[in-house]
Amino acid sequence: MSVLSEFKAFAVKGNVVDLAVGVIIGGAFGKIVESLVGDVIMPIVSKIFGGLDFSNYFIPLAGQTATTLVEAKKAGAVLAYGSFITVAINFMILAFIIFMMIKQINRLQSAPAPAPAPAEPPPPAEDIVLLREIRDSLKR
């Protein structure tokens, strides 16, 4: 088998195609989460903490006196911990959403099959039926 045909067989396997689809959807989903955090959650957090903009939180490492992160990065090295806070919140939200999705998938996959209806008990043996008839006739 040639290398090209082996690669073709590998590339069209279900797992590889599923992985490719997952990566593409994951990239798009990451952008959704990034927008959720940047455009919805962080403004609310900023409002709660008095109008703070976490993206501009930094510590200058070169002694510069810039007022924004962009200016500080142009002037020298900075420790941009505000950006890190935003990325950490992105990660926590994304990890939680993925955890909930996997939890639901596992619940659906491991749903127990419905229990079969109980089978009717087998009819009693002929000698038991005969003995019951004799007993019933003696009671009368």
Curated annotation (Swiss-Prot):
Its main location: membrane. Pfam families: MscL. GO terms for molecular function: mechanosensitive monoatomic ion channel activity. GO terms for cellular component: plasma membrane. Keywords: Cell inner membrane, Cell membrane, Ion channel, Ion transport, Membrane, Transmembrane, Transmembrane helix, Transport. It is found in: Cell inner membrane. InterPro entries: Mechanosensitive_channel_CS (IPR019823), MS_channel (IPR001185), MSC/AndL (IPR037673), MscL_channel (IPR036019). The chain crosses the membrane at residues 21-41, 82-102. SUPFAM superfamilies: Gated mechanosensitive channel. It comes from the Bacteria. It is a multi-pass membrane protein. Channel that opens in response to stretch forces in the membrane lipid bilayer. May participate in the regulation of osmotic pressure changes within the cell. Belongs to the MscL family. PANTHER family: LARGE-CONDUCTANCE MECHANOSENSITIVE CHANNEL, MECHANOSENSITIVE CHANNEL MSCL. NCBIfam families: mscL (TIGR00220), PRK00567.1-4 (NF001843), PRK13952.1 (NF010557). Homopentamer. HAMAP family: MscL (MF_00115). This is Large-conductance mechanosensitive channel.
